[in-house]
Amino acid sequence: MSSRSTKDLIKSKWGSKPSNSKSETTLEKLKGEIAHLKTSVDEITSGKGKLTDKERHRLLEKIRVLEAEKEKNAYQLTEKDKEIQRLRDQLKARYSTTTLLEQLEETTREGERREQVLKALSEEKDVLKQQLSAATSRIAELESKTNTLRLSQTVAPNCFNSSINNIHEMEIQLKDALEKNQQWLVYDQQREVYVKGLLAKIFELEKKTETAAHSLPQQTKKPESEGYLQEEKQKCYNDLLASAKKDLEVERQTITQLSFELSEFRRKYEETQKEVHNLNQLLYSQRRADVQHLEDDRHKTEKIQKLREENDIARGKLEEEKKRSEELLSQVQFLYTSLLKQQEEQTRVALLEQQMQACTLDFENEKLDRQHVQHQLHVILKELRKARNQITQLESLKQLHEFAITEPLVTFQGETENREKVAASPKSPTAALNESLVECPKCNIQYPATEHRDLLVHVEYCSK
């Protein structure tokens, strides 16, 4: 009865297998949730999946559920630890066995160490969640920056191409203006040479007219015989002078026209020079703008390279975090196996306690049986001593009585005495023990001394 009660108590304290199956299902669920989180983190790191608000909300809900499960498991562990402490106190109060206490202390220390490891794992899990949120925000920032840089890169080449086209057009116009300027310079030089030649001819004709004018009065003073020749010469000179004057007028007109054209060409040349200067300034400013634009592009490329390096570093950190999460999963699995081993050890300890209680009960029962048998033997020995004393007294009285009887009866008395001696001789202790009776103190049922075990069973049944 007592052994059954202890078994039931141990079963009620330690629980049964459904709780273990429930904890296993919760652990499997946690493993599935962690695997799903790993896949989502892999999708984020690979850049294939972009987190929407709905998915982020769903992940936050899953994280909250996991935290609730973690708190629930922690509460269950604390309750089990309290139960273990209470059972240990009960065992310490009931039994003074040092080995069991040492084993229980070792198991409690192991449980405390595992609780510390679980706390550390939960803290690392929180850190991983924070790093994951920071990494997702950083990836979102990097994606927005890369999109803006791509847009700027698509806009910048168009502007650069248009500016390059404008520069090429301006260079072509400048080359045309320089060629025209060179042609105008050559033409101007040729016109100056031509004008100088005309002026020299005009100067020579003027000299000839002057010499002809000085020679006319001298020729009139000559004799009239030479008059006809002189008139002919005068006509020739007049014709030459008129033609020279006409040529001079024509040349003067051409000179004025050429000077006007020269002034026009100079004005155009100055305008072209101004245009060339303006184009040079515009080209210089355009080149400076292009250099600035190229410098900005270089800075942008450096920034893009830096962002790519930061992205690579973030991916490396994510890989490290993935490895750490895998290590944590392996540690969780190891802890799960160790918890299973601990539960097996606890069941073994419970079985050992049960066996020890059964052994102690059997020992107590045997001790009580032995004490009762010793008491019965002591009583039987006392009764045996009393019987022996009574027999000796009766024998002495009988001998005195037989001495008073007549002599003829001596022989018959001797025979009867021998018979009585044989009959009254002390029996062996085993025979006396077999003939002695033991009775129940409650219902007064008698049992032989050899059947003392049956008497004990009867007493236990009768005392109920």
Swiss-Prot record:
Annotated spans, Required for localization to the interphase centrosome and to the midbody during cytokinesis: 355-464
GO cellular component term, pick one: centrosome
Superkingdom per UniProt: Eukaryota
Signal sequence, start to end: none
Phenotype upon changing residue 428 to A: Partial loss of phosphorylation in mitotic cells. Complete loss of phosphorylation in mitotic cells. Remains associated with the centrosome throughout mitosis. Arrests mitotic cells at the midbody stage
Region described as Interaction with TSG101: 157-236
Subunit and interaction comment: Homodimer. Interacts (phosphorylated on Ser-425 and Ser-428) with PLK1; the interaction is indirect via the MTMR3:MTMR4 heterooligomer, occurs during early mitosis, regulates the phosphorylation of CEP55 by PLK1 and its recruitment to the midbody where it can mediate cell abscission. Interacts with AKAP9/CG-NAP; the interaction occurs in interphase and is lost upon mitotic entry. Interacts with PCNT/Kendrin; the interaction occurs in interphase and is lost upon mitotic entry.
Region (Disordered), start-end ranges: 1-26
Substitution effect: residue 191 to A: Abolishes interaction with PDCD6IP
Coiled-coil positions: 22-186, 238-337, 374-403
Job of this protein: Plays a role in mitotic exit and cytokinesis. Recruits PDCD6IP and TSG101 to midbody during cytokinesis. Required for successful completion of cytokinesis. Not required for microtubule nucleation. Plays a role in the development of the brain and kidney.
Tissue note: Expressed in embryonic brain. Expressed in fetal brain ganglionic eminence, kidney tubules and multinucleate neurons in the temporal cortex. Expressed in adult brain, cerebellum, kidney tubules, intestine and muscles (at protein level). Widely expressed, mostly in proliferative tissues. Highly expressed in testis. Intermediate levels in adult and fetal thymus, as well as in various cancer cell lines. Low levels in different parts of the digestive tract, bone marrow, lymph nodes, placenta, fetal heart and fetal spleen. Hardly detected in brain.
This protein's UniProt keywords: Cell cycle, Cell division, Coiled coil, Cytoplasm, Cytoskeleton, Developmental protein, Disease variant, Mitosis, Phosphoprotein
Record annotation: effect of changing residue 425 to A: Partial loss of phosphorylation in mitotic cells. Complete loss of phosphorylation in mitotic cells. Remains associated with the centrosome throughout mitosis. Arrests mitotic cells at the midbody stage
Lineage: Eukaryota, Metazoa, Chordata, Craniata, Vertebrata
Phenotypic consequence of residue 188 to A: Diminishes interaction with PDCD6IP
Organism for this UniProt entry: Homo sapiens (Human)
Pfam families on file: EABR
Location of this chain's protein in the cell: Cytoplasm; Cytoplasm, Cytoskeleton, Microtubule organizing center, Centrosome, Centriole; Cytoplasm, Cytoskeleton, Microtubule organizing center, Centrosome; Cleavage furrow
Name recorded for this polypeptide: Centrosomal protein of 55 kDa
